[in-house]
Amino acid sequence: MYDVIVVGGGSAGAAVAARLSEDPARRVLLLEAGRDWRADEAPWEVRTPNPIPIIHKREYQEKWQWPDLLSRRVAGQESRFYWRGKGLGGSSMMNGQIAIRGVADAFDEWAALGCTGWSAKDVMPLFSVIEDDLEFGAAEGHGRGGPLPVYRAPPETWGPIDRGLRDAALASGYPWCADLNGPDGEGVACYPINSRNNRRFSTNEGYLEPARGRANLEIRGHALVDRVLISDGRATGLRVHIEGQGTHEISARQIVLSAGAIHSPAILLRSGIGPADELKAMGISVARDLPVGRHFFDHPLFRATIQLHDKLRPIDPDTRHTNCCVTYSSGLADGGKRDMILIAFNHRGIGNPGAIGAGLFNAYSRGTLKLASTDPSVDPVVEENMLADPRDMLRMMDAVKRLAVITSQPALSGIADWIRLADTDLTLPQAAHLPDHELDAVLRRETGDIQHAAGSCRMSGFGDANGVVNPDGTVKGISGLRVADASIMPSDCRANTHFTTVVIGEAIARMMVR
């Protein structure tokens, strides 16, 4: 029997499996639905610092993602493909590599919601543990020697829209920020990314490669978990479909679900853990009535397309899509510190136009995730419900007006044939001058997401029935079962979610070995 089975080898799961297996007396099995791959075997689409091909090309979606997973971003839109990594490294092997820390105030909010052990003083030191910051590692509050390199591309390597956004935002009065992960990390900045020697560095390379020689760590790829086996209120194992080997039941003393904000809740629902009415409607016996899938959120993003002058268009397939961003506090609608981000997109695929975008880093709208079938090979139904909360719409409207000012600066207007919204064909100044009800309608058409799924197995205080897991990651009312990934976020971390998700894995692993 295994001591622990970890489900999912992504941003959090790789950290959990690696940390728990540091004790040679603890037998750990890591199950990954996608392929088990080695760093020295990684093909170009996984190595390149440009994530656009692996995200958008169908052949790579089928190889490295869940190709049939859809979500509806905003009510009234059609459901579209939702990219999530499938393979060791999870979404860290196909995301934008962004390594931004969550905001200290956000973690203090988690603690205020009853999540003891998740305040800024508890969480922020773990960011130093996981990083190998090549530029600021020796500075107070930073780290060197951790499993994940943090790199900032020198400005001379940036793309034209990176430089345009930087110069236009500075000219518009936004301050320069040398270190976005510093205590006052807000302003015009270079993205910190997980990269080494101009190649992506996922949690597979950072955590699992160094741990592979351990006799007590077993890694199995192409292992699709159907459900958790539960007896008398205790998790006893898993029912798993292993490619080429059929279906097996595997026993363990403890189970940790780190399958991500889409598939961890789906596994719980198939296991009879979730809203009782939904489970009964699917013919699933109820093991525990909990609000699984009821708190889903992502970061809304709208983009204006930028058609660069011919001579400025990138031609190197390894050109990064973005190096520069602007983070700021809107001062509106309970946004809090660093609730917004503006993003440069040098291209959306080599040969295609670039863009400039604005997104929420503190989203209040909440969506749902529900089963479409009890078959584990069928992805769940995701309704993101973006912009439903008026606090989100108000700040997105303000961002349109900010971008209208920034894109009028010569640093951006001077490099473009045109800049306009993709669906409505409006320029940003035109959109900014619309009456509120018309701008509302435009944003509902134009808004997508940043692929930062979170919140679907929400953490709440011990004894608080409004959550799915307790502050130690244990599923409420079920012994021997935890969740450790972005799905447990009780509210927004106000950053790209990858780095905070790794920290969640580190934190839960530490709680398990105390």
Model regions and ranges:
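N-terminal redox-cofactor-binding region of secreted/periplasmic oxidoreductases
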Residues: M1-R514
